[in-house]
């Protein structure tokens, strides 16, 4: 007696005995001996990931099958991967990933990217941000996106070092193997209020004073390269200036200068 199996056009059948895979059957009807019948593992060629145990076996004992039927996603410590199906980004693979995927003709592709080049490719950034029905792209947390509006600039720091300013627009950066920080800065004229300052005049009169100062950045890059938080620094400087201006004068002198 014989056993018949049917393999669809989008499938493979892997035959094994005692856990050893020895033959691949393609689409069609196949007849297997009833006695000592091999085990049959039906594989759907849908771009899915090959389970780790099977992937390790194929790498060791059937490398020709890996080359013919699988997409190999072995990434170095400085590589990320963009996995596409039919031109649609499915997943961002992290460095040191080691996976196999079942091929779907030429519809499954992997784009390798060097994460030492911190800016992310524009096409990958756009694909990550594109709205989709099935949720967000898996692995997108490896990418930092920065939106800088009009009349603003972005301050980019990589591993603690301030880089060139970012113009208005959208950019993205790898958070892998680097500490990437950004801050969006308004370059327009702004108002900073120093409220409720209680200060003694030179003649010991207690005054409660509010101060409003108009200001804007003259050199954003210089400010952020020298100061961690420029606005906090400006606030303290205004406090000191106010205390010096009031504390070194009598009340009458202040009223005269008013």
What residue ranges belong to the model's regions?
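N-terminal hydrophobic membrane-entry segments
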Residues: 1-258
């Amino acid at each position: 007696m014989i056993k018949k199996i049917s393999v669809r056009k989008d499938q493979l059948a892997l035959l094994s005995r005692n856990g050893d895979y020895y033959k691949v059957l393609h689409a069609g009807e196949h007849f297997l001996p009833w006695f000592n019948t091999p085990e049959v593992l039906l594989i759907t060629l849908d771009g899915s990931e090959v389970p780790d145990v099977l992937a390790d076996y194929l790498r060791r004992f059937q490398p020709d099958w890996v080359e013919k039927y699988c997409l190999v996603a072995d990434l170095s410590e400085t590589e990320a991967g963009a996995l596409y199906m039919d031109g649609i980004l499915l997943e961002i693979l992290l460095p040191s990933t080691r996976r196999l995927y079942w091929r779907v003709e030429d519809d499954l592709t992997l784009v390798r990217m060097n994460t030492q080049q911190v800016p992310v490719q524009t096409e990958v950034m756009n694909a990550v941000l594109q709205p989709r029905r099935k949720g967000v792209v898996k692995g997108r947390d490896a990418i930092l996106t920065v939106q800088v509006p009009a009349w603003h600039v972005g301050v980019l720091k990589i591993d603690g070092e301030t880089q060139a300013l970012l113009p208005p627009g959208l950019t993205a950066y790898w958070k892998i193997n680097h500490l990437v920080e950004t801050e969006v800065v308004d370059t327009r004229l702004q108002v900073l209020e120093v409220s409720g300052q209680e200060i003694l005049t030179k003649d010991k009169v207690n005054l409660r004073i509010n101060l409003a100062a108009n200001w804007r950045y003259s050199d954003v890059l210089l400010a952020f390269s020298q100061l961690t938080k420029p606005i906090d620094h400006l606030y303290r400087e205004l406090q000191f200036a106010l205390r010096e201006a009031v504390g070194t004068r009598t009340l009458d002198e202040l009223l005269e200068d008013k």
